[in-house]
Structure formats: structure tokens, C-alpha cells
Amino acid sequence: LDRSSAASDVYKRQELHNPDHDHIAELLHDNEEFLAFAWASSAAVAKKRMVLGQCEKVMFNQGGWKKARQEQQMRDWFGFVPQYLITVDATFCEQASDREFCRLIEHELYHIGVERDEDGEIIYSDMTGLPKHYLAGHDVEVFFGEVKRWGADESVKRLLEISKNAPFVSETNIAACCGNCVIG
């Protein structure tokens, strides 16, 4: 075993780890029912745009048998009713590069927000002792035309500054950490 190669592989795996999602990983370690993933046979369309993935907090806004059927469908699919469900377009994922796939999954994971206090510490539920989660919106949501006419607000300016830096995760590091690439 080449130690420098092994050390390099460990470094690359660490580079893919995102501490922003530690609150999810910790819950999954103790409770696999927190999150489930599903494949869709095609993209969805919303607001005239293709939707390749969607994260949703699982809620049944039905009563009686409708709710019971929906819960049973989840149990049939996953063996449990998850708190959050991420659905991705299988057709897109099949042809996506490793980078595109990882980015899609990470984007959807960012929608699982964790409540924090004014010091940035995670807020825990008094009843369950678990972190309080919510379905998070996007950090920056603005129209190109709006920025052209009125300029960039603080969130857009921050995004521009961040985008000037090289990404933390390179294509090479993704391939080195991909189970299919490493095993195959």
C-alpha cells in the first residue's frame, strides 16, 4: 500500500465532507428515518423550468384514508415514513457527471435547514432533544434583469465574492471518492 496515495485518498474524501450538513449526518447515524431518497423517472417542470431534484418535509395534508394510503406508500417504499424526502430525476442522474450529481444532492441537502440561536448554536427541541429542522429557501433568489436595473443587493454581492474563489471540491477529488469509480 502506497501511504502517500492512501493519504491523498483520505484527503480527497475529507474534501467532499461538508460540515454544513453535520446536523443531518448526526441524525442519520442515530435515526435512518430522518431522510430518504427517491428516484423519479423524469424531470418535473415548475414555473416553466426543469426541476431535477426536490427536497420536501414529508407532511400529509389529507385526512382519513388518503393520509393512511400516503403513509403506507412511504412504508412500502422505504420501510418507514421519513421526515424529509429528496427526489431526483433518475434520467438526469444517469448521464450526469460525478460533479453534477454531487452538486445536485448537496443543493437538495441545503434545503434541510437547522434552527440556530443568535450565537449560531443549534437549537434543540425540549420535547425530543433533537435539533430543530425546517425546509430552507435559497440564500440568493433574484432575477438577472432586476440586478441589471437596480444593482446587486448584499446577498448577490456576497455570492459574487464567493464565486471568485476556486471551488473547494475538484472533479478529480469527486472521482476518487465515488464508490463506483473506486470499486470499478
Residue ranges of model-derived segments:
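Active-site recognition of the HExxH zinc-binding catalytic motif
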Residues: 103-115
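…; additionally, a secondary subgroup of soluble metalloenzymes is captured
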Residues: 98
